[in-house]
Amino acid sequence: MMESGVPPCAACGDDAHAACRACSYALCKACLDEDAAEGRTTCARCGGEYGAPDPAHGQGAVVEEEVEESHEPAAGGVRERVTMASQLSDHQDEGVHARTMSTHARTISSVSGVGSELNDESGKPIWKNRVESWKEKKKEKKASAKKAAAKAQAPPVEEQIMDEKDLTDAYEPLSRIIPISKNKLTPYRAVIIMRLVVLGLFFHYRITNPVYSAFGLWMTSVICEIWFGFSWILDQFPKWCPINRETYVDRLIARYGDGEDSGLAPVDFFVSTVDPLKEPPLITANTVLSILAVDYPVEKISCYVSDDGSAMLTFESLAETAEFARRWVPFCKKYSIEPRAPEFYFSQKIDYLKDKIHPSFVKERRAMKRDYEEYKVRINALVAKAQKTPEEGWIMQDGTPWPGNNPRDHPGMIQVFLGETGARDFDGNELPRLVYVSREKRPGYQHHKKAGAMNALVRVSAVLTNAPYILNLDCDHYVNNSKAVREAMCFMMDPSVGRDVCYVQFPQRFDGIDRSDRYANRNVVFFDVNMKGLDGLQGPVYVGTGCCFYRQALYGYGPPSLPALPKSSVCSWCCCCCPKKKAEKSEKEMHRDSRREDLESAIFNLREIDNYDEYERSMLISQMSFEKSFGLSSVFIESTLMENGGVPESANPSTLIKEAIHVISCGYEEKTEWGKEIGWIYGSVTEDILTGFKMHCRGWRSIYCMPIRPAFKGSAPINLSDRLHQVLRWALGSVEIFLSRHCPLWYGYGGGRLKWLQRLSYINTIVYPFTSLPLIAYCCLPAICLLTGKFIIPTLSNAATIWFLGLFISIIVTSVLELRWSGIGIEDWWRNEQFWVIGGVSAHLFAVFQGILKMIAGLDTNFTVTAKATDDTEFGELYVFKWTTVLIPPTSILVLNLVGVVAGFSDALNSGYESWGPLFGKVFFAMWVIMHLYPFLKGLMGRQNRTPTIVVLWSVLLASVFSLLWVKIDPFIGSSETTTTNSCANFDC
C-alpha cells in the first residue's frame, strides 16, 4: 500500500497498511493489535469499523486513484517528514512529534476528502480528538512501563546515598590548608619581634662597651655575634607564615575514577644510580619494586632507571628484578601490604596479620618470602661476581662484549624490561613500564653528573611515554606509602591549586637511624619547621628526591597565571605573604610572546603554499623555533608542546627507541638551553637547590605534602665520617651557587616574581657555609680566654645584665614556641643544635675553601657518592671510625677547650678566691662548646669506648703545643712577682 501512496503509520511511523477501508486511515499491524487488545475497533478518524467494506467502493477507488495520480508528490513529502519524525528518540520534544503527526493527519484528510464533516461542538474534527487521546494513553502506558523498569534496575537506597556522596565529593576541593592555631602562632611572632629588639639593644651595648685590655678578643667576638644575628634573621623570618596541608584521596578517586578508565594523569618515575658497589643493587631493586607496585593505574606508571656508571651489574640485577616483580606486584595489590619494598616489608617487627582477612594470606606470604630470599641470593651472586673485573671486560649472556665496559667512553643504552610489550605478571595483568637507561659518554664532553643524567631521563621519557608529571627518587629511597602518587595528584590535578604548581615536595624520612639520632640524620627541624614555613610563602625548596614535578615547568615555561609584583622594590614581611595584583610580564616572556606571534605569522604564510603537508609544516616550525632550546629531535620538540602529555601521533612507534638513543647522545645538549634554562640546572653539585630556585624565579609555586604515613623512606649515612662528607657536598654546592651568576643576592629581580621572604630563605641556603668562619673563631675564644686570663665582656652592670638575660630568655622562649607549633621533640631540636656546630667547624669550613679554590684556580670538585649501609649488625656503621681530614678542626677545638678548662682551674687555684668569679663565666663558655661537640667526641671513641690511635696522636700533639704556650704565658706567676720582675728590668743590676 506504501507503493500506492499510503503514508506510514499515523501513530509510530513504521510501515503501515490502510486499517480503515472507509477513509484509508493508516496504521501498522502492531498499533492495530494494540487497539484491538484495548477494545478499540473503530477508526480514530471516521468512526467506522476497522475492516468494514466501503459503502461507496467505486467512489473510494476513484478517490484512491486520484491520490495516487494527482497527489503523489504531496504524499511523498509527507512520507519524508513522517519518516524523519519516526527517527526521533523518545527523549525528544513531544511537541515536535505531535506537530508532525497533526500535519500528516491534515494532509491525509484533505486528500481523501473524508471526515471533514465530522466535527465536534468546538469545530475541531472528532478524529483528531480521538488520535490525540489515543496517543496520550499510549504515552502514559510507555511512561509507566519505563518507570517500572527504572525502579527495577535502580540500586538500593544505600548505594544511591553513596553515589550521591561520591558525586558531591567529585566537586569538592582535593586539598585544603590547615593554618596554625593563632594561640600558637601569635605568641611565637611576638617573641620573634621581642627577640629582634633585644638583639638590637644587645649589639648596642656590645659595641659601645669595648674591652680595651683584650681588644682583639672583644672585636673578634663582636664580629662573630653580628654574623650570628644576621644568620638568625635569614633563618627565622622565612618561618613567619607556617601552614599545614591536608589531602582528600577519596575525592580524587570520585572525580577522576580508578582502574583502566581512570582520568588520573600518567606519571614517570626517575631513579638514578652511579656505582653499584657503593649503592648496592639490592637497595636499588627494592626502590624499583616499590615503584612498580604503587597504588595507581598500571598503564599510567613508567619507571626509568638511570645507570650513570654503565655497570653490567646494574643491568643484570634489573633484569632479575623485572622477573621477580611478576610475582611481587600482584601479591602487594591483592593483600594491600605496606610498604611495598620487600626488604623492608619482611624486616618489619610488627604483627603482619593485623587487618588481614584472606585465609590464603599466611601461605602466600610464606611462599613470597621464600621467593624473595631466593631472589636475594641471585642478586648477591651477581654482586660477588662483579667484585673482580675480567681483563677482557664483561661479556653478556649472548657472548657479546658489554658496551659499557669503559664507564667514561661508551654508547647510549636503553632496554625496556616491562610494559606494553613486556611480560605480564603471573595473574595475567599488565605491569608498569620499566626502562633501563645509560646515556652515552665520550671523552671531551661535559656530563654534569647527576643533573646531566636527570636531563637525559627527561628527554628519553618524553620520547617513549611523555607523562605530564615526573617523580624522581634516589636509588635508596623506596615508596613507603603506596598512595603517595595520589597524594601528589591531589595538588597537581586540583584546578583551584595545581595551575601554578611546579612541584610537590615530600619530606625525607629514614630507616636504620640510631634511636638517639646522634648526628641529626633525620633533620627534623628542617623538614618539620623550615619547610612548613616556606610552604606558607612560595613553597618549599627542592631537596633532590621525593619530588613530583610538572614536566612543563622543567621545560623553562612560566606558570599560566603570573604572581603578584610588589608595590615597591623593598617589600616587608607582611606584604610577602599576601596576594597582590597580577604582575606584568618580564622582558623575557615578552620576547617569547613576540616569537610566538612571529611563528603564527609564519604559519599563516606557509598555509598559503598549495599542497603543503600539515605535518611537515608543523615540524619545520618546531625546528625553527625550538631546536636552539631543546636540541635536534623533532619527536622530542613535538612532545614539549603537549601540555597534557602523551606520545605525539606523528611519531612512528618503530623508531621511538632509535629517537630515544639519539636524545641521550653525549653531544645532544651542545648549543642548547639544557642545564641553563631547561631541566635540572648545571653549575653546582647541589643541582636541586638551583633547579627549584629557577622555577620560583619564574613565578611558579611549590607545595609541601606531609601525609600521615611517610610517602618515601631512605637510608642515611649514620657513620660520622660519611655523614660529614654528605654535609660537605651539600655545603660545597651552596658555596658554588653563592659564587655563580645564580646567586639569590643578585639573580632573579627582573620579573619580581620571587617573594622577598622566599628570596631570604634562598640566601640563607647559600650563605650558611660561611658561618663556619665566625663559628670556629667563636668556639676557640673560651679556651683562649682561659689560657690568657682575659675575657671578651667587661664587668657587667645592671643594665648589661638585663640585656644578656633578655637575650637568653628570648632565645629559649622562641625555641619552645617553635617546638609547640611544629610538634617536634626537644631531643630532635637539641641534636640539630649540636650538629649545627659539628658540621659548622668541620665540613662547612672545608666547603668554603674548596669552593673558593674552584673559583680562583679552576679546580674541579669530585662528586663522592655516599656509601649506603650494608652492615647486617643493627647500627653497625655507627661505630665504624673512618679517619678523614674533615675531623681535624673539631678535634682540635675539642682538645683546646679541654686544655683551657684545666688551665683555668689551675690558675684559679693559684690565684685565690677573687679569680673564681670570672672563671665561672669562662668555664661556662667553654663547656657550651664541649657540650655541642659531645656527639662528635662519642663518634671518635667508637664502639668500645676507646679512642683510635690517630686521635691519641693528635691529642698528644695538640696538648704539647698548648702546654708550651701555657709555659710561655706562665699563669702560675703571681702579680707581685711579675711587678718585681718588670721593675728590675728597668735597672742595670
From Swiss-Prot:
**What's one GO BP annotation on this UniProt entry?**
cellulose biosynthetic process
Q: Which residues lie on this side of the membrane: Extracellular?
A: 206-213, 794-798, 857-884, 938-946
Q: Per the record, GO CC terms?
A: plasma membrane
Q: Which portions of the sequence form the region Disordered?
A: 138-158
Renumbered to this chain, the Basic residues biased-composition regions fall at: 138-149
Keyword Ribosomal protein, does the record have it? no
Q: What Pfam families does the database record attribute to this sequence?
A: Cellulose_synt
Query: Belongs to which family?
Result: Belongs to the glycosyltransferase 2 family. Plant cellulose synthase subfamily.
Name listed for the protein in its UniProt record:
Cellulose synthase A catalytic subunit 4 [UDP-forming]
